[in-house]
């Protein structure tokens, strides 16, 4: 099917939906909801299609005027200027139109659960987890997103074995999803007398937050253990059994939550993380079954995949998926100015999807 035929088919579908919604008495409640959703999704696409069609019509009209032997010289000259101007606009509008036709990730509008864990490198890796946590929370503040720490395990000297947080706001998952993977840091530890460069790593997992209504978990599939929470070094920090460990028996996923003093709050947070992990597990299975979508785009987001290196001596950050290097390490890590990386990753993702857009 040609590009223009695809647009015509979409337009016909849109106006058919519009007609149906104008007479909702003919629709069941479920059909009305489904039609309304599809209509809303097509509305911005139709707006760009109209813009594209008007531009094409203008170009055809100007071309006819230019080729008409009865057109006087002055009018023909003006028509040529207008024709070339419209021709320059056409590729941009066509590109905009193709972007609007790309399949949407239904999770993009969701909030996100961000999990940061120390990898290889001991205490240096734990300190890097803290650095990444600060970078992402600063970025969240810039975007006017809200964030809440879900769980953390500190090392007692400024580092963390792991930190997880929930970030909520507009298009959080859409902007953070490409942060999943292995982040590597190269720097000289303060305790290193010889000045030798150490390499450490941390893993980041970005999961869409799933509401209870979107994913039901059977209570029979859960084993819930409660115990006293502990701090750095294993010492008890609570005299009541407030810490919660939830095991999802079918998948083997285990979530531990002990930050809150209330057992009820710890259980609620643990279930929130469990839902996100189960949803992500199913999503990864679907992606692998369909077309290995993650690998065909920017990268799999797999934790074994090194995605970015932070070199402190050179104030350099390199994203290996898109070969982008920026020499603004403090600006990015301390102030959270991540947009240049994020925009480039989104653009790369769109470019790869466009290659697979068969129209």
Swiss-Prot record:
GO CC terms, sorted: cytoplasm
Stored InterPro entries: PCRF, Pep_chain_release_fac_I, Pep_chain_release_fac_I_sf, Prokaryotic/Mito_RF, RF-1
Post-translational note: Methylated by PrmC. Methylation increases the termination efficiency of RF1.
Key word Protein biosynthesis present: yes
GO molecular function: translation release factor activity, codon specific
Entry keyword annotation includes Manganese: no
PROSITE patterns in alphabetical order: RF_PROK_I
Keywords: Cytoplasm, Methylation, Protein biosynthesis
Function noted in UniProt: Peptide chain release factor 1 directs the termination of translation in response to the peptide chain termination codons UAG and UAA.
Entry similarity comment: Belongs to the prokaryotic/mitochondrial release factor family.
Name assigned to this protein: Peptide chain release factor 1
Gene: prfA
């Amino acid at each position: 099917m040609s590009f223009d035929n695809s647009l015509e088919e979409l337009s016909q579908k849109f106006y058919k939906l519009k007609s149906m919604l104008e007479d909702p008495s003919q629709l069941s409640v479920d059909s009305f909801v489904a039609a309304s959703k599809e209509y809303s999704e097509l509305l911005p696409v139709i707006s760009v299609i109209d813009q594209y069609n008007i531009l094409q019509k203008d170009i055809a009209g100007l071309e006819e005027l230019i080729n008409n032997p009865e057109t006087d010289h002055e009018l023909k000259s003006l028509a040529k200027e207008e024709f070339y101007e419209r021709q320059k606009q056409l590729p941009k509008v066509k590109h905009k139109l193709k972007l609007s036709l790309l399949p949407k990730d239904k999770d993009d509008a969701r909030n996100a659960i961000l999990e940061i864990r120390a990898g290889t490198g001991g205490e240096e890796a734990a300190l890097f987890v803290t650095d990444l946590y600060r970078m992402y929370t600063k970025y969240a503040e810039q975007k006017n997103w809200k964030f809440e720490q879900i769980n953390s395990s500190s090392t007692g000297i400024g580092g963390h074995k792991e930190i997880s947080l929930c970030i909520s706001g507009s298009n959080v998952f859409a902007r953070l999803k490409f942060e999943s993977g292995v982040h590597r840091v190269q720097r000289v530890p303060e305790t290193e007398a010889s000045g030798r460069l150490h390499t450490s790593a941390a893993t980041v997992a970005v999961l869409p937050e799933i509401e209870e209504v979107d994913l039901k978990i059977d209570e029979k599939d859960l084993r819930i253990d409660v115990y006293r929470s502990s701090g750095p070094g294993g010492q008890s920090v609570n005299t009541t059994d407030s810490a919660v460990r939830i095991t999802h028996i079918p998948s083997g996923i285990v979530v531990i939550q002990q930050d809150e003093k209330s057992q009820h709050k710890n259980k609620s947070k643990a279930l929130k993380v469990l839902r996100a992990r189960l949803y992500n597990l199913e999503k990864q299975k679907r992606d692998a079954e369909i077309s290995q979508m993650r690998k065909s785009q920017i990268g799999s987001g797999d934790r074994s995949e090194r995605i970015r290196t932070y070199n402190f001596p050179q104030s350099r950050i390199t994203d290996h998926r898109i070969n982008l290097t920026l020499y603004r390490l403090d600006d990015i890590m301390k102030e959270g100015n991540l947009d240049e990386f994020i925009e480039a990753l989104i653009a790369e993702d769109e470019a790869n999807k466009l290659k697979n857009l068969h129209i």
